[in-house]
């Protein structure tokens, strides 16, 4: 609140339940003994600079997320680019990975292949594709199990992940999620097959990137979707309804607000 005040973003004359204005409350808090003690404890007990907990704008972190586009994700995907290991970046902060697609239509199958020691195992240099895990396919689950497995798998740092599912804040590495359109909504991700050439380029400083199929694009776009793609039969009815409504309303870019007229038209 003090930072907001200092940047003129608060109505300091607004009354509060204390009987004082916001400005008066903040002036008291800024000089209060309680605040001073809290700041001292953080420094003396934990070795933490209080101004690193809630940072002022001049010390703000840069964005940690890169927006990626390309012929595999024409409506975009996102990656937590600050979670990519520094040794995977060049001197300009660029992550570049080119490799064959390894396509899975369920998280369970991907985990099994990551743990396998047989011929079906995921190889170093692969691009792990998790398709059909968006809202229509699986309710857009958090694919934590895959990223957790990657952390301990021998090939973990030497491959990339591209999916229409989502990731949590604990994801690490070049894991691109929210690929849009999702595979079951006709997205190109659903056309990929094992061995297809894929190129992922992420500029972690400019926060832009691309995810592309690098083979014959004309032939690729004519393909049927992956034969294994289908909605998860375990999806509850309310999740299926939500997925259908958000898809009718615009998917990734519009589905957060239902388009009532479009939904009625489709009904």
PLM-predicted stretches and their roles:
Residues 1-158, 163-183, 187-267:
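Catalytic or ion-coupling anion/metal-binding cores of large enzyme and transporter domains
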